[in-house]
From Swiss-Prot:
Pfam families linked to this entry: NGF
Sorted UniProt keywords: Cleavage on pair of basic residues, Disulfide bond, Growth factor, Secreted
Organism: Cyprinus carpio (Common carp)
GO cellular component terms given for this protein: axon; dendrite; extracellular space; synaptic vesicle
Disulphide bridges, residue numbers: C21-C101, C64-C129, C89-C131
GO molecular-function terms, A-Z: growth factor activity; nerve growth factor receptor binding
Propeptide: 1-7
Family, similarity comment: Belongs to the NGF-beta family.
Entries under PANTHER family matching the protein: BETA-NERVE GROWTH FACTOR, NERVE GROWTH FACTOR NGF -RELATED
Gene3D superfamilies attached to this UniProt entry: Cystine-knot cytokines
Subcellular location: Secreted
Name by which UniProt lists this protein: Neurotrophin-7
Any one GO BP annotation for this protein: cell surface receptor protein tyrosine kinase signaling pathway
Length: 140
């Protein structure tokens, strides 16, 4: 027999395992407005100074992947994909269940400004994409 090939950690799709909702991760470096723990709309400052070094504020977000409709428009014609909250979850029995994928949030610290006061506050960012279920009919 030949040498064994080591399987990658992300090769799980070959085992028949799929995510119920597709998500994507990305760094956000241009966040200007956010909601804090108290529900206030605060301004996120673009840079922070730590030990006399200026750093750009970056946030790592996970969001529901926007699926493109079949027969997507050609380049230059615009794309109106399905927004999070409108696509049903994978593997759900649509005859008995309503389902949709939606973003859930977490709070992270950020340097912000609110009512002319600059402070570190917890702001809400997208943390994951989850499936929401409800019964299609209450009859069994």
């Amino acid at each position: 027999p030949g040498p064994r090939v080591r399987r990658k950690a992300n090769d799980f799709l070959h085992r028949g395992e799929y995510s119920v909702c597709d998500s994507e991760e990305h760094w956000v470096g241009n966040l200007t407005q956010a909601t804090d723990l108290r529900g206030n709309e605060v301004t996120v400052l673009p840079h922070v100074r730590i030990n006399n070094v200026v750093k750009k504020q970056m946030f790592y977000e996970t969001t529901c992947r926007v699926s493109k409709p079949i027969g997507a428009p050609k380049p230059g014609q615009g794309v109106s994909g399905v927004k999070a909250g409108t696509s049903s979850c994978r593997g759900i029995d649509n005859e008995h269940w309503n389902s949709y994928c939606t973003n859930v949030h977490t709070f992270v610290r950020a340097l912000t400004s609110y009512k002319n006061q600059i402070a570190w506050r917890f702001i809400r960012i997208n943390a994951a994409c989850v499936c929401v279920l409800s019964r299609n009919s209450w009859r069994h």
